[in-house]
Each structure stands twice: as structure tokens, then as C-alpha cells.
Amino acid sequence: MGRIEERFGVKLASLQDLFDVLNRSHDYFAARNCVASDHGIEIPLRGDYEYADADKVFRKAMAGEALTNDEMNCYMGAFLTECARLNSETGWVTQLHLGAVRDVRKSLFDSMGPDVGGDISNHYLDYAGALCSFLNRFDDKLKVVLYCLDQGHQATLATISRAFGSKVALGSAWWLCDTPIGMRRQLEYIGAVDTLMNFAGMVSDSRKLLSYGSRFEMFRRVLSDVVGDMVGRGQMPEEIALNIVRSIAYDGTKKFWNF
């Protein structure tokens, strides 16, 4: 928070002060044609927080006092909800990458710092309650893309996407699932529960710029293979299959992301 105060020339005495800075930052990127924000959160966060409660937590943390898990979730939920509110006003897409537990190997973190291979996935997460609370707060007012690490959660996210309609989409297979096998399994499953057209398409947040072409090429080949198999089994007419592939690979994705 000290770096934020220095960068923006403000004193963060309340949660609203932080929200004001967030608004300024959001305006800066919006003026430069940003169309999405990406949020990595270990557990889904509710959208029904009370500002007064979150403000108390913020002031407590700024005073150097320790926070409970519930207090941290209250603050993080408030911050994410404010980000989503700003996104809904400007038409940005809100990406939620769910379930990654960061830096679990202490010796690796101590010697090399964060994000160097010490992250894992967490299967024991309750997606439905908190996530539905968040989505209900912005029902039909916010484009959201949901990503999960554990394929066991695909059923929950696919049915949530279907329940909330076209503005809540499923993201492409992520991280350890971002392989031909992982992509195929995901596409086959979401096709089976009738959400294939409610798919956000391939989006890469990779730091490896030179891999962009190969990653998108691999996804399109897997997509064509999966849909082609469905045509071969008589599950889908060829004309519809071509429209689906075209939409996921380009047309629908371009429209969803406001490109």
C-alpha cells in the first residue's frame, strides 16, 4: 500500500481511498483500449459483502493488525466486486482464474521468489455458493470468463455458465490442462452439456510471446478434431459444426472480447 500511496500521491486512510485509486488506474487503461482484467484467486469470493465491514478490515490491516481468513476474504471480495463494477461500466471482460495455490515450497520461494514453479492446484474448493453470489450481483451486466485448474470442477463451472447465460463463459483449458489432452477433455465435456457455443475461445495470458502462434494453432487443431469427431458420429450436421468452429476460433471470440 505504501507503493500505491507513493505512486498516486495519496494517503490511503479508508477503503474508499483505495477504490478511488483503482478507479484512476482503470480509467488510465480504458483510455488505452484495454478490454479485460484478469484476477487470480484461490477461492471464489462472494459479491454480497457490506462496505462497512470491508472498510473495518482495511483499516485494521493498515494499522498492522493480523487478519482472520474471514476478514481477508471480506476484503478481497470487496476489492474484486469493485473491479467488476468498473468493468461493467466500461464493457470490459472480467476473467477469474480459480483454484491456484501459490508458492507452496518454502525453500524454493525463499531462494528464488514467487512464480517459479511452486504453485499447485486445489481440488477441495466450493465453487457454487460464493461464485453464484458474485455472479448474481452483476447478473446480465458483466461479461465473465471462468477458468479452473482441476477438471473435476468443469461440471460445476459448465452448469453455472449455462445457468447465467451468454455473458458468463467458460475459458480455455488452463495451465497444467493446457495440453492437447486437457483441451480435448474440456471441449468434449462442455459440448456434452450444451455449452460449446458459450465458450470464450482460446485466450493466452502467457508470458512467452513466441509461443502465442503455436498455442493458438494447437487449440484450433484440437477444436477441429473434437467437432469433426462429433460430425463423424452423426451428432452434429457439418454446416452447424463449421459455424461453431468459426465462432469459437474467431467470430464469436472477437465479439465477446470487444476486439
Where do the PLM segments sit?
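Histidine/acidic residue-rich metal-binding segments in metalloenzymes
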Residues: 2-143, 152-168, 185-201, 218-224, ...
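Acidic-and-aromatic substrate-binding clefts and catalytic sites of carbohydrate-active enzymes
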Residues: 147-154, 175-183
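Short active-site-adjacent structural elements
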Residues: 209-212
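Exposed alpha-helical structural elements
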Residues: 53-57, 130, 182, 240, ...
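Beta-strand segments within the central parallel beta-sheet cores of soluble alpha/beta enzyme folds
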Residues: 144-146, 242
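Glycine-rich flexible loops
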Residues: 171-175, 183-190, 240
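Intrinsically disordered, low-complexity polar regions and short flexible loop motifs
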Residues: 205
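Mid-to-C-terminal alpha-helical segments outside catalytic/metal-binding sites
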Residues: 196-197, 214-259
